[in-house]
Amino acid sequence: MINREDLLKNPVEDIALRDLEKYSDIVNVFDKIYGFSSEGIVRGSKILKEMIKDADLRFLSFTANLVSTGLRGLFADLVKRGYFNIIVTTGGTIDHDLARSFGGVYYKGSFDIDDAMLKDLEIHRLGNVLVPFESYGKVIEEIVRKFLPEIAKDKKEIPAYELLWEFGKRISDSNSILRAAYEKKVPVIVPGIVDGSFGTNLFIQSQFLNFKINLFEDMRLIKDLVFSCKKSGALIIGGGISKHHTIWWNQFKDGLDYAVYVTTAQEYDGSLSGAKPREAISWNKIRPNAKHATIYGDATIIVPILAASLLS
């Protein structure tokens, strides 16, 4: 029988852009190699650089699983440095960011550990990341119970993005995405905010606090940003609701001008997650003349490469 302590030895660590400085020219290496997936990385890097210079509305869209990894700190740093000015993500992002901001520690594990054993040891498994029970649900519940009453005292109804700024304001962890978003006043749009521990705890506490989230105000904000921008671009990591919400709203301005997809999903099953940018063109979500690229691979490998290239 494996002891719990034997599994929870090596914590996941957040990275920042400074950790990637010595790799800033790595895309030039891929440019020389060129063949097969390397070309996608090179093309995506070039588009991303041009997008950041040219587009005034720059979306960072990603799925929550990545926030359990060291990419969390990198996302926060990209926001702090001004590369992106709006985030679209999922409810789990809030869970992981809050949990890790207030003492929750995630650990390096394996895809192959016995899950029944992990359950007995009170450890969740997220891919090869291990999340002790005490580092997740309990932490989030305590945070919401602590902070929501003082937030609700002044605001009985609040847009979700403002609520997330309020939580970000109360975070001191420099690796926090919510903290970075609050400091830079970057809206974090979470269309599925009720889907997760944070959303569930908001619902429970709302029964006692007469507190409501106004998601229509989030829609109004993203509408105003899209309609008022000259050009928009997006780095879309993964699929699902965060990908769709990003491209959905851009159809109302005749589509994104720039789009870089990082994905492992395939298009043969007709899924939104696997759909390539060219399909979005048919829906008016990406302009026919837009610059776009699809990079296939694990985001924990691809995203640091793209981020490093921004420093060159």
Curated annotation (Swiss-Prot):
Pfam families: DS (PF01916). Its cofactor is NAD(+). SUPFAM superfamilies: DHS-like NAD/FAD-binding domain. Gene3D superfamilies: Deoxyhypusine synthase. The keyword Zinc-finger does not apply. Its EC number is 2.5.1.46. It catalyses: [eIF5A protein]-L-lysine + spermidine = [eIF5A protein]-deoxyhypusine + propane-1,3-diamine. One of its GO terms (cellular component) is cytoplasm. Catalyzes the NAD-dependent oxidative cleavage of spermidine and the subsequent transfer of the butylamine moiety of spermidine to the epsilon-amino group of a specific lysine residue of the eIF-5A precursor protein to form the intermediate deoxyhypusine residue. This is Probable deoxyhypusine synthase. It comes from Saccharolobus islandicus (strain M.16.4 / Kamchatka #3) (Sulfolobus islandicus).
